């Protein structure tokens, strides 16, 4: 317990991180507190009582979900073996049919195409999805190098995509149910990144669990056969 207490000071809501609701009956925690010098004891007690109001953005959202983290990740965060970091989990896929699966089990991690393999996070990584970016572009041709060099932009010029739907799941559980792609039309919103949809209900994706982001189109009429989609899941992740 003492080694965990020494590693959690950078976080808010550490009571949830450590899996404790209070001091009563927690002899291990009380013993660790007694062994601290008075200044450190006061600082630790203050952190234990914190509601997480100091942190902002995706990090604050992650701290609110500490109680949902697996025990091994909680322990590694407490010991300082894992930290919280900003990230975007991304993937590029061709619009070759009305159903586009942005993360698939046969995918390999490759710079410029995607940064996860097999549609799963690596071991010891938990990821809180705070927002989603969806962009479209037309590659010069269908070779991998040209696809990687595609300039992705707003969906407004791709009406069949705008009028389609998307869903996001993890371990077969809905994070975002079928929702109109119109939410990614942000060209006229000067305070919102291009193609960014902020989730009002952020959700965790756990390590080694299948994640599925599916784009469904009603029609492909008018789309260039070289059209590709870029999706980015923005949020906070645990990392060494």
Predicted regions and their residues:
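Beta-strand-centric surfaces of beta-sandwich/beta-rich domains
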Residues: 1-240
């Amino acid at each position: 317990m003492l080694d965990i207490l020494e590693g959690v000071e950078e976080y808010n809501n550490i009571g949830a991180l450590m899996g404790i609701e209070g001091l009563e009956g927690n002899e291990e925690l009380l013993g660790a507190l007694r062994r601290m010098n008075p200044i450190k004891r006061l600082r630790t007690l203050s952190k234990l009582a914190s509601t997480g109001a100091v942190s902002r953005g995706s990090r604050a959202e992650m701290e609110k979900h500490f109680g949902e983290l697996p025990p091994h990740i909680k322990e590694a965060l407490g010991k300082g073996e894992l930290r919280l970091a900003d990230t975007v989990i991304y993937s590029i896929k061709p619009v070759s049919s009305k159903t586009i699966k942005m993360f698939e089990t046969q995918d390999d991690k490759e710079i410029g195409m995607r940064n996860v393999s097999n549609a799963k996070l690596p071991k010891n990584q938990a990821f809180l999805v705070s927002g989603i970016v969806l962009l479209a572009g037309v590659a010069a041709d269908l070779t991998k190098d040209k696809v990687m060099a595609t300039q992705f932009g707003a969906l407004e010029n791709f009406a069949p995509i705008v009028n389609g739907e998307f869903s996001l799941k993890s371990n077969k559980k809905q994070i975002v149910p079928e929702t109109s792609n119109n939410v990614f039309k942000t060209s006229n919103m000067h305070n919102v990144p291009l193609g960014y949809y902020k989730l009002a209900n952020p959700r965790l994706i756990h390590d080694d669990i299948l994640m599925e982001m599916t784009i469904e189109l009603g029609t492909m009429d008018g789309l260039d056969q070289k059209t590709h989609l870029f999706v980015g899941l923005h949020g906070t992740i645990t990392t060494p």
